[in-house]
Amino acid sequence: MQLVQLANFVLDNLVQSRIGFIVLFHCWQSDESLKFAEQFMKPIHPILVYHQFVQMRGVLNWSHLELNYMGHTQPTLAIYVDIKCDQAQDLLEEASREQIYNQHYHWLLVGNQSELEFNDLFALFNISIDADVSYVKEQIQDNNDSVAYAVYDVYNNGKIIGGQLNVTGSHEMSCDPFKCRRTRYLSSLQKRSKYGNREQLTDVVLRVATVVTXRPLTLSDDELIRFLSQENDTHIDSLARFGFHLTLILRDLLYCKMKFIFSDSWSKSDVVGGSVGAVVDQTADLTASPSLATEGRLKYLSAIIETGFFRSVCIFRTPHNAGLRGDVFLQPFSPLVWYLFGGVLSLIGVLLWITFYMECKRMQKRWRLDYLPSLLSTFLISFGAACIQSSSLIPRSAGGRLIYFALFLISFIMYNYYTSVVVSSLLSSPVKSKIKTMQQLAESSLTVGLEPLPFTKSYLNYSRLPEIHLFIKRKIESQTQNPELWLPAEQGVLRVKANPGYVYVFETSSGYAYVERYFTAQEICDLNEVLFRPEKLLYTHLHRNSTYKELFRLRFLRILETGVYRKQRSYWVHMKLHCEAQNFVITVGMEYVAPLLLMLICADILVVVILLVELAWKRFFTRPLTIHP
């Protein structure tokens, strides 16, 4: 055996693969092993390779092969196996049982078997699609100093789902005692990446777990597939159908067949039952219906790519008795501004009285007023000017008229700012409820209904949030005997429209379509919305140890990059309601006018009371004195 040339070939292969650790299973003599190791440790090589020799002679049991011989913490460990050894077949069979022909091990299987013999040996082995297995066939050259090594790429698209062994010639190396060089290519493998050469799964039938909630599972598979394939009524089972259509695109990219496994829920608990449980126990290779990537699931699954958006909300119209606001006419200014403005008006009222007094006492008779107004009258003039009211009394002096000019100017500025703020407030969208969180909703007196979705019930059962526990106690447990607690999305949305104050909990991908169907644009803007649960992204999942992980990730990225994913998502997933308030006129309701009318009524009552007091005062306390002769 030309061990020096073989050592050079192995070292060159490790350099090209960027691997620095190798375990060599061999049946050489001690001096041959020493010669091979000496060639490894020569300083002419560009890298230092950690190597470990395992003598296969005398090993009767290869059980726990990975645990006993391949323990490592490296991303990839190289494994050399001399398949000419008698014990090599038992070792390779055990590796197949333990499913370690995968991307974490770089296998170099060296022998001189023909391709047909190698196919017969490996046809039954469980070699994965991500396997990094190379069969190396050696042939000694005529000059006896160089050895030719033909390298073949070996993989299987999936033995347990119908895949066949694939052995493709890659290239040929010629090695002498000093160096190795590539002499020729045996195929076009080098023109593409590893997964570029393995992207077509024409010989396998992928098992795909799919959720169907809007149709009974008693229907035939063809009927369920026909329902999921439809493109109308996107609000019915939209998440499941969105994922199903993405899976059909993946099927076309991989040129494979698919067998769909149907279930009526994502899972019974976090990782048991449903489509998620099917992937966890490896009865399915992929989930077509996107699901949440929870902490418990990520122990068994890998999230490949984001393929959905999960959003549950509570919508309701503001109750008629919840929108009365008495402070809308005071909001433009803070209390301090109102106090200062009142003080300025009072000061001007005093200055006006002083002005009128001086004009009556000091000016010429032809310029004097007919009478001196009281201090109360000047206060009334001042506050009337603030309300854009004129006055029958006008100062005749230059100073008095300057006071009037300042009064009307400041009143004009304040009035215009005040009216602009009030009008914009009154003509904006009608008053919204102050309920913004689940805690406030649970503490309110509003009636609640829910859409009967499995993940909503699961969230109520397993959520640890205190506001959800309070919501269950006050809104759910009190209605356990109410048959209308769980309502279909269409009925729930119609009840929200008919009953202000009725709260309906639904998933946006299904419920928003009914809202847009039954509500006008103005009514949509009037709706209150409370987030039922934190917004979550949905992912397509594979088993954590799935050999298709990288291939599927690359294919889904291709779907994302070409814009196909965005098109499908915009068609199937409704993210938000569109409120276009500028397209209609909003009328001012009683929630704003009622406080104003109440203020006017109170003022009228006060005026009548004052009038009665004045009449009584005049009648009983200001009687004319009777003079007797």
UniProtKB/Swiss-Prot annotation:
Residues 357-374, 424-592 are cytoplasmic. Glycans are attached at N61, N112, N126, N144, N166, N232. GO terms for cellular component: cell body; dendrite; plasma membrane; sensory dendrite. It comes from the Eukaryota. This protein is translated by readthrough of a stop codon only in neurons. Readthrough of the terminator codon TAA occurs between the codons for Thr-213 and Arg-215. There is currently no protein sequence that provides the identity of residue 214. Olfactory receptor for propionic, butyric and 2-oxopentanoic acids. Belongs to the glutamate-gated ion channel (TC 1.A.10.1) family. This is Ionotropic receptor 75a.
